[in-house]
Amino acid sequence: SNTSTVHRRVALAVAAMWREQLGVITELRNEEWKVFVANRRQRRETEVFRGGWIADYDDAGSFLDLFATGSPLNWSGFADAEYERLLGAARAASDPDERARLRGEAEARLLDAHPIVPLYFYTSKHLVSPRLRGFEPNPLDRHPSRFLRFAE
């Protein structure tokens, strides 16, 4: 749900900072997830909204492709021909270094255009015994026990 206590605390903190530092008065609106998604898809007027994404595969495209023209999750409405060209070239690149370079250029272009403002990043910490085998860090922070075992 988009109505979690953590999201509300972040929104209140940002609103307070904007009021104190910039003189910007905000009106906070808390929406259930289904309402939030429907409003974004219908492009209902909202000047700022909180969104989040966790990569479901280990590639920068998991984030960058969200802002491609035509992406159903491009709720910001961002559209930029050079960004599209860079994404397409990165998808077509067979060399990993070239692909990373192109994705880096696309990311810089996206951030320079300001359709998003990264506020924070989810992190996780695990204390793992050196004897534990099968524990692999991953973007979703999921660790099925069927893959875990202790070494002798």
Question: Residue spans of the language-model regions?
Answer:
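Short beta-strand-to-loop elements that line the ligand-binding cleft
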Residues: 25-32
